[in-house]
Amino acid sequence: MSSIEEIDTDETFTSDYVSARKDEVDDIITATTIAQKKMENSILEKLNSTENGNIIEKKKILNFLMNGIEKIPMSHQGLDSSKVWISFWILNGMDMLDSLDSYPNISSRASKYLSILQNDDNNGNNNNRENNQNGGGFGGGNSHTSHVVSTFAAVSALYVIGTEESYKTIDREAMYKFLMRMKTKEGAFTSEDGGEYDSRTTYCAIAVASMLNILTAELERGVVDFLLSCQTYEGGFGAYPFNEAHGGYTFCSVAALSILNSLHKIDMNSLHRWITYRQSNDGGFEGRTNKLVDTCYSYWQGAVYIIIQSYFNYYKKQQQDDGDGKEGDQQEEGLLFNQAKLQEYVIRFCQQSDKKYSGFSDHPHRGKDYYHTCYGLSGISLSQYNEIGKAIQSLNTFTNTFEQPSPPINKKSTNVFTISNNNNNNNNKNNNSDDNNNNSNNNNNNSENQLVEPVHPIYNIKLSKCEKGFEIDLFLFQKEFKDASVSLGTLFFYAKFILK
């Protein structure tokens, strides 16, 4: 008899949804329902625990991230090709805690390390190896060939560092050649020479091009049609046409279409319906229908909510303007998901702390890691600022005004997750009014301490770093273009953008 058949199906289900349909699901036991049941039990344990797990352990999280700068745990040996991603997760996590400079010389050291991962065009000095005829881009680790996804991680990490040294690290001309070489006839981008292509690799290529101001018509050609073909009957997007809708690929498709000013071409009502059902009673987001929630989807799904809400708000305002000729009302509205419940899932259920370190795991009672710590903080950030994406602007680069994306942050959310001192029990019912007022003030102070830095929903980089990066990148472009010593080939390269 299999382990699945041995399970006692008369055992009480803790989920309200499942309990209401117990007769329907008792005969359909799968690995997912078993895992879901275990996770719900873990959440109940956390809810009944008296341990202090209701706040973001910022100092301990910072210790955990900084510890990864010098040495990576033995368990990470299999991630050698993801060194560039580990760098981004650590740097971005520290930056969201507004503590990037807490580690001595981290900006300079990180910039120099990331420069080693860059492959120059035509056998340049970086990563010089035999038959390296096709340079440009970044590899995932030392001496690795260039990969579009690794390139996105490297460029993002250099943006997070935010110094002139980090911006100058990137060879934009070689990068453009690399991206063009990855372009497919379907309008997508392959991961590497001879590699696969999907909506993920396509987003990474488009995001890199937009961040480096090298997004041209020839790079954009066919991309919108390919991404739109990835939307499924469910409403979300798959890796490529006729795949199952998936939270990560949905983010990649929606974010790339936002960069390309094509959100209006999406079946938005279908997408809205699909993503609305992705938040569970636990507060977390699941990546696919009938799958477990996962901390990383706090960003992947949370960002999609914000992007499409920006779309709805924009057209709502347009309709108001067209109706009465006056500027549309700026109503203060919450986001399309339960912000406080999402923060509760990440902070209370998935934060794993010991005496020295803290971080986030994918599920309750699992080990913390850099990946989920980074995206857990990103999801918390997105849920703490109601207007973070209210005015996502056109991301076309090199217009007459050189406008770049920088969604405004006008107010903090009122839905910052806090737990009262009585920990949801009735022991303090007899507190006098003065005590209650003090508790209220303490909760307000705790709310301020629980805020993390706001990140851009499309790039997952702190907004101030996004704005600074686009401004400095534009300055470097203009400076290089005006330099009399620039090569003829480089002049032809930059002419693509001047004549766009």
From Swiss-Prot:
Biased composition, class Low complexity, residue ranges: 119-133, 420-449
One GO term describing the cellular component: protein farnesyltransferase complex
Residues at the site labelled Important for selectivity against geranylgeranyl diphosphate: 85
Function: Catalyzes the transfer of a farnesyl moiety from farnesyl diphosphate to a cysteine at the fourth position from the C-terminus of several proteins. The beta subunit is responsible for peptide-binding.
Family membership noted in the UniProt record: Belongs to the protein prenyltransferase subunit beta family.
Subunit field text: Heterodimer of fntA and fntB (farnesyltransferase). Heterodimer of an alpha and a beta subunit.
Protein name as it appears in the record: Protein farnesyltransferase subunit beta
Originating species: Dictyostelium discoideum
Gene: fntB
